[in-house]
From Swiss-Prot:
Pfam families: Pribosyltran. Its EC number is 2.4.2.-, 2.4.2.22. This is Xanthine-guanine phosphoribosyltransferase. It comes from Agrobacterium fabrum (strain C58 / ATCC 33970) (Agrobacterium tumefaciens (strain C58)). Purine salvage pathway enzyme that catalyzes the transfer of the ribosyl-5-phosphate group from 5-phospho-alpha-D-ribose 1-diphosphate (PRPP) to the N9 position of the 6-oxopurines guanine and xanthine to form the corresponding ribonucleotides GMP (guanosine 5'-monophosphate) and XMP (xanthosine 5'-monophosphate), with the release of PPi. To a lesser extent, also acts on hypoxanthine. The gene is gpt. GMP binds at D102, T103, G104, K105, T106, W144, I145. Pathway: Purine metabolism; GMP biosynthesis via salvage pathway; GMP from guanine: step 1/1; Purine metabolism; XMP biosynthesis via salvage pathway; XMP from xanthine: step 1/1. Its main location: membrane. It is a peripheral membrane protein. Keywords: Cell inner membrane, Cell membrane, Glycosyltransferase, Magnesium, Membrane, Metal-binding, Purine salvage, Transferase. It catalyses: GMP + diphosphate = guanine + 5-phospho-alpha-D-ribose 1-diphosphate; XMP + diphosphate = xanthine + 5-phospho-alpha-D-ribose 1-diphosphate; IMP + diphosphate = hypoxanthine + 5-phospho-alpha-D-ribose 1-diphosphate. Xanthine binds at D102, I145.
Length: 165
């Protein structure tokens, strides 16, 4: 598989720093979160970091599979919903966490379940920004983010193809 023209590889160190930066932003909101709902699978890692930083012990998952070919995003399939006790008060006091909002399709699906929850993600693309309350880094819509859990160590082509450094 060749990399898209705008590839944005993220290391474990960078992701950890960015997830902590998201936790700092959330802490600055002066909101009391009673639980985290992480959107799997991408939300698992930032939820672990944020739950530690904000001392939130109640964590649930909403499992949504997005069919994609690593270039285009497709339909979503709900595999597991949110625990009923977290949907009381329309999700007031619940923090929904994901790694990325791309088109916003997944966030909108979860927002139907938890309309009063606070939605946060580490990275956001322009189409997804309106669906998220708090994020750290915005990238262009045509950028493909490679998360550390999706990568191994391989040779990277230079940005300027054909240059002789």
């Amino acid at each position: 598989m060749s990399l898209p023209d705008k590839a944005f590889p993220v290391s474990w160190d960078q992701f950890h720093r960015d997830a902590r930066a998201l936790a700092w932003r959330l802490a600055g909101l002066d909101k009391e979160f009673r639980a985290i709902v992480c959107i799997t699978r991408g939300g698992l890692v930032p939820a672990a970091i944020i739950s530690r930083e904000l001392n939130i012990r109640m964590i649930d998952t909403v499992c949504i599979a997005t069919r994609h070919d690593y270039v285009n995003q497709g339909d979503t399939v709900l595999l597991k919903g949110v625990a009923p006790e977290l949907t009381t008060d329309a999700g007031e006091g619940v923090l929904v966490v994901d790694d990325l909002t791309d088109t916003g399709k997944t966030a909108l699906e979860v927002r139907e379940m938890l309309p009063r929850a606070h939605f946060a993600c580490v990275y956001a693309k322009p189409k997804g920004v309106p669906t998220i309350d708090t994020f750290v880094t915005e990238v262009s819509q045509d950028t493909w983010i490679y998360f550390p859990w999706d990568m191994g160590f391989t040779y990277q082509e230079p940005i300027a193809k054909g240059s002789r450094g």
